[in-house]
Each structure stands twice: as structure tokens, then as C-alpha cells.
From Swiss-Prot:
Protein family membership: Belongs to the heat shock protein 90 family.
Region (C): 553-626
Listed name of the protein: Chaperone protein HtpG
SUPFAM superfamilies, per the entry: ATPase domain of HSP90 chaperone/DNA topoisomerase II/histidine kinase (SSF55874), HSP90 C-terminal domain (SSF110942), Ribosomal protein S5 domain 2-like (SSF54211)
Keyword annotations from UniProtKB, A to Z: ATP-binding, Chaperone, Cytoplasm, Nucleotide-binding, Stress response
Gene this chain is encoded by: htpG
One Gene Ontology term of the molecular function aspect: unfolded protein binding
Length: 626
């Protein structure tokens, strides 16, 4: 009998999985039972596509058997079974999912719930066993095969005898160690508890022979043990249970069973609606961002059931994109089981459900923000960007739904605040909601442009996400207060007297500023005296709708079109540097060019923009140091 080797990457993955992916060894039973449920699902799917086959539910079950004396644990099912090739392909290559392959081969796009998407769950058996045997007979085949492995070194496959189709997994449970008690995985009570904890909603019976006691017939005062078969799981979907009977742990276990994530949900929503359209739904807001969430590969959607039967694995129409992070299920008796994807997309009932779900999610998030601020801020850290994308997309049509869910870091509060909180404490004379854009809060606090607004005592919101300013441009205003960047040309904070003084400064220094503008030859739209600078000598401001930060974001995209914002070089005429500029203008034009180039490049660096000629810049610094 030949021993075959796992592929090298499979060895590494097996080691990684055992030591990293699964933190609790009891998870192995959940994974193996889920695989058994998948196998029965596949039989059921075949009956839907083959009229000659009948599905008698009583014939399909999962059985768990413990043999404490021989340290053997068996998990058997009456599912579809596997051929020799399937054993080798599905179990010989870790992370090769048989369920996923079944979906591809049978074009199962919706209509069936097959849990095993990732192909690693089976190998959790090695958490508690160092000798794993799989005996399987495929549906429609006369041959059975035995697969055996004692770990990452390899496996064997040989013919064997098995009467009925299905699969039996036989685990030789490890001996106890000082750190681990493996005996518990042979105890009836422990096995029953694990099944109830993780697999209570598996829709096929999970059977065990449980030890019970009864009085002896010849002596009623003495008791004897006997075995009686029981179905351990309830098989009643959690969403059909009374909410008052469920605990947080029940929802968390369901979340884990459905593989919605390795985290715990930060919020669950259990809702039942009766009306024009009736449905039950359980929705989850995850705690952490899925690794692929902000990629094209991520697929949003809720599982859609009709009368308890899955008809679509991920129904994207049930969620708007900005709530695409929500996981969960919807079950409605008003949807037909055989409804096609095309009809479903235009189904009136489905649209009503989607509208209700959108409102429910929004209300729950608002409640979380109001009542559990810490949880909301944790959620926002993971998914706030998606809400801002929602404001920006579809030409701002969703801004009224999302604007009260937005949060930004505040210069005054030194924490995240909502727009409503900002507006509520605006001084009466303040006209605008001010914001500053930068790579981080620390960088923003050092921006020269922010000095004038802070000096006035006004609060500034910090925008550190690429999407922030784009979203706010689409929002335009909040409670009739317009948004204003601290880098915009007109801040709207000058008094009449100061405004006149500033204009007078521009007139007095008109020739100097014109000379500087000529030196920069088209790099800036204008050079003028700054109304905002207090301690810094120079900064860049922008005019028009396109800001400097938006220029950076757009030019970083793959279709770079070399977009340029209209920039204004602002000079602090109260800074010592300005005196040097005036002296150079009056007596040394070469020095004026040197100073102008240095100040412009300094302003570029402050904005995080690249300077055109770093060598010339460093040479100019050396010149003024001589």
C-alpha cells in the first residue's frame, strides 16, 4: 500500500491551521459535522435536478459514536460520499474544497447551502487525533475506499467494504498530556454540549446513543445503564425562534457556524415583520473588516431563504453597497422556492424587504451611536470608510441617510465627533464647518493653514481618509452650514477692518508678489499676503472646487491624468522671512529667485507634494548657508 505525500504547501498549511487558525480544540466537531451536513445537502441537490430520485428526510442523518475503551470517535453521515479520486483531491490537498468544486461542477449558484467553502475544516480533526481514517462510498458507486493519515507526512488510500453510501470519519483520540485533557472528547456529556453549542441549527438530525439508567427489573432499588438513541440538535432555525428564548451566545454561535467571520459580531439584529410582505431576518454587524472587504473580490449579500429553504447564498439586492459589511439571513414565505435569479432581481416583495432592512440597519446604527458610543466608534474604525463611500457614490443621493452616522476627529474634543455635535457648539458668528485634510491627525495639527481658524477659537474636523473630502464635497452642507477647508482661498473669518488691511498689504506688495509669480512661471495661480498664517512663513492655499489633497488622490489612481489644483502661494508678511524677501526684491533679483524657489518648495513639502528638482532644492539650501 503506497503512502502518498501531501504537497509542500499543504504541510505548512496543516501546521499553521492546527497552531493558529483554531484556538479551541472543540471546534473540530463543529467542522466535521458541517462537512457531513454538506454531504447530505449534495444528495438533496441531486434530487432537485433528477426527477428519478426521491429525498426521504428520515433516511438522512449524522451519527456521532464514542468508544472510550479504544479511544475512538466516529462521525458518520448518509450523505453523497466520495470516490477514490474525490478522496485524493479533496483530502489530499489541504484548502481544496470538495463543496466548492461540487458547486462549480453542478453550477450551483443559488438554491443550496453548502458550508464547506474553504477546504480546511476537515483537517481540524488533527487537533484531537494523530490517526484519522475516512471510509467513504460515493452515491451511485459499488466501490468504497479508506483514506488514512497520521499527520502531515502523508496519507494512504485503499479499497474497503461499506454497505451504504456515505462517509464515516474515525478519529483515534490522542492520549492526555500535562497541558491537554483529550479524554473529554470521548465523554457523552462533552460531545453533546459541543454539538448543542455549535451545531444546534444543522438541519439534519445529529444522533447519539446516550447512556441512561433505569431500575433493575428484579430489584427496583438498584439501577442499570442502557443506551438510547437521541437527536441532539434542535434543527429549528434560530431565526424562527422566539427572541426572548435566545441569548447573545446563541447569536454568536450562529455567526460562527455560518462562517461569517472569525470575530464576534459587534451587533446583531433579529427582526420579524408581518405586513404587505412578511419575513424573518437575523443581521450581524461584524467587529473587524474582512481582509478582502475593500477589493473587487468581496461579494456583499445576505442569505435568502424561502420557507426555510435557501434559494440564494448571497443576495446582493438585499443590501445597499454602503451597508455591504452586514452579514446574515432573510427568510420569507412570500418568495417562491423556484423563483429564478432574473425574476428575483425584479421581485416587488424583495425590494420591500430590502427597503425595510436598510431602514432597520440605519436605525440600529444610530441607536448604537447614541447608547453604546464605544462600540460604535469601534464599528466606525472598521467600516466608516464604507459609509463615506456611500455618501459620495450615486451623486450624493444617499447623503440624507448616512450623514448623521459620519464621524471625524475634532481639534477641540481630541476625539471622534459627529457633524451634529460639531454644529451644536458652533459660536453664533461662525459661518462654516471647518475641516483640514492630511495623512494623519499629527500631520494636520502641524499644518500652517490651520493656525488662523484655531486662533479664532473655531473647531476643525480632521480628514485623514482619501474619501473624506470627496464625500464632504458631495454632502455640500449640514444643517444649512457649508463646509470650508482651512486651505481654501477665503476662510470667511476676517473682520471688515482686517480684510481691508489684508487687501492693503496685497496692494503695497503687488510688484513683489507679481515678481514671485513670474519666477514660479505657472506653478501657482497667484502670490498674496496670507490672512491665516501666524507663525509659519508660507503655505499653499487652493482656489476652486479641486483641493490640493484631492489632486494627490486623483493622481495616485491608475488612470493618472496629471490633474492640478489651482494653487496660491501665501506669504506671512509678519514673518522675518518676508523682510528678507523685500530686501532681495529691492537689491538682488538672483537672491529673490533663490528665496522664492525655496519658499515654494517648502510649501510643497508641507503639503506632502513632490518637489520638481530635489537636487536644485538642496543646492539652494547650501547657497544660503554659505
Amino acid at each position: 500500500m503506497e503512502t502518498k505525500q501531501f504537497k509542500a504547501e499543504s504541510k505548512r498549511l496543516l501546521d499553521l491551521m492546527i497552531n493558529s487558525i483554531y484556538t479551541h480544540k472543540e471546534i473540530f466537531l463543529r467542522e466535521l459535522i458541517s462537512n457531513s451536513s454538506d454531504a447530505i445537502d449534495k444528495i438533496y441537490y441531486k434530487t432537485l435536478t433528477d426527477d428519478s430520485l426521491k429525498f426521504e428526510r428520515d433516511d438522512y442523518y449524522i451519527r456521532v459514536v464514542s468508544d472510550k475503551e479504544n479511544r475512538i470517535l466516529k462521525i458518520a453521515d448518509t450523505g453523497i460520499g466520495m470516490t477514490k479520486e474525490e478522496l485524493e483531491n479533496n483530502l489530499g490537498v489541504i484548502a481544496k474544497s470538495g463543496s466548492l468544486q461540487f458547486k462549480k461542477e453542478n453550477e450551483v449558484k443559488e438554491g443550496y447551502d453548502i458550508i464547506g467553502q474553504f477546504g480546511v475544516g476537515f483537517y481540524s480533526a488533527f487537533l484531537v487525533s494523530d490517526d484519522v481514517t475516512v471510509i467513504s462510498k460515493a452515491f451511485g458507486s459499488n466501490e468504497a475506499y479508506k483514506w488514512n493519515s497520521k499527520g502531515a507526512e502523508g496519507y494512504t488510500i485503499e479499497p474497503c467494504e461499506k454497505e451504504a453510501y456515505g462517509t464515516e470519519i474515525i478519529l483515534k483520540i490522542k492520549d492526555n498530556t500535562e497541558e491537554e485533557n483529550y479524554d473529554e472528547f470521548l465523554e457523552e456529556y462533552t460531545l453533546k454540549s459541543i454539538i448543542k453549542k455549535y451545531s444546534d441549527f444543522i438541519r439534519y438530525p445529529i444522533k447519539m446513543d446516550l447512556t441512561k439508567t433505569k431500575p433493575k427489573e428484579d430489584n427496583k432499588e438498584e439501577f442499570e445503564e442502557y443506551k438510547e438513541e437521541e437527536t441532539i440538535n434542535s434543527m429549528v432555525p434560530i431565526w424562527r425562534k422566539n427572541k426572548n428564548e435566545l441569548k447573545s451566545e446563541d447569536y454568536e454561535n450562529f455567526y460562527a457556524e455560518k462562517h461569517y467571520g472569525f470575530d464576534k459580531p459587534i451587533k446583531y439584529i433579529h427582526t420579524s415583520v408581518d405586513g404587505v410582505v412578511s419575513y424573518n431576518a437575523i443581521l450581524f454587524i461584524p467587529e473587524t473588516t474582512p481582509y478582502d472587504f475593500y477589493t473587487k473580490e468581496y461579494e456583499k449579500g445576505l442569505e435568502l431563504y424561502s420557507s426555510g429553504v435557501l434559494i440564494m447564498n448571497k443576495c446582493g439586492d438585499l443590501l445597499p453597497d454602503y451597508f455591504g459589511f452586514v452579514k446574515g439571513i432573510v427568510d420569507s414565505e412570500d418568495l417562491s422556492l423556484n423563483i429564478s435569479r432574473e425574476i428575483l432581481q425584479h421581485d416587488r416583495q424583495l425590494k420591500l424587504i430590502a427597503k425595510n432592512i436598510k431602514t432597520k440597519i440605519k436605525n440600529e446604527l444610530e441607536s448604537l451611536l447614541k447608547k453604546e458610543r464605544d462600540k460604535y466608534e469601534k464599528f466606525y474604525e472598521s467600516f466608516g470608510r464604507q459609509l463615506k463611500y456611500g455618501v459620495y457614490s450615486d451623486f450624493g443621493s444617499n447623503k440624507d441617510i448616512l450623514q448623521d452616522l459620519l464621524m471625524f476627529y475634532s481639534s477641540k474634543e481630541k476625539k471622534m465627533v459627529t457633524l451634529a455635535e460639531y454644529v451644536s457648539r458652533m459660536p453664533e458668528e461662525q459661518k462654516y464647518i471647518y475641516y483640514a485634510v492630511g495623512e494623519s491627525n499629527e500631520r494636520i495639527e502641524k499644518l500652517p493653514q490651520i493656525e488662523g481658524v484655531l486662533d479664532k477659537g473655531y473647531e476643525v474636523l480632521y480628514f485623514t481618509d482619501d474619501i473624506d473630502e470627496f464625500a464632504i464635497k458631495m454632502l455640500m452642507n449640514y444643517k444649512e452650514k457649508e463646509f470650508k477647508s482651512v486651505s481654501s482661498g477665503d476662510l470667511g473669518i476676517e473682520g471688515e477692518e482686517k480684510e481691508n488691511t489684508s487687501n492693503s498689504d496685497d496692494k503695497k506688495n503687488k510688484e513683489l508678489f507679481e515678481s514671485m509669480k513670474d519666477i514660479l512661471s505657472g506653478k501657482v495661480k497667484d502670490v498674496r499676503a496670507s490672512k491665516r498664517l501666524k507663525n509659519h512663513p508660507v503655505c499653499l492655499a487652493n482656489e476652486g472646487e479641486l483641493s490640493i489633497e484631492m489632486e494627490k488622490v486623483l493622481n495616485a489612481m491608475p488612470n493618472n491624468q496629471n490633474i492640478k489644483a489651482d494653487k496660491v502661494l501665501e506669504i506671512n508678511i509678519n514673518h522675518d522671512v518676508f523682510k528678507s524677501l523685500k530686501e532681495a526684491y529691492e537689491g538682488d533679483k538672483e537672491k529673490l529667485k533663490l528665496y522664492t524657489d525655496l519658499l515654494y518648495n517648502q510649501a510643497l513639502l508641507i503639503e506632502g507634494l513632490a518637489i520638481n528638482d530635489p537636487v536644485e532644492f538642496t543646492n539652494n539650501i547650501c547657497k544660503i548657508m554659505k
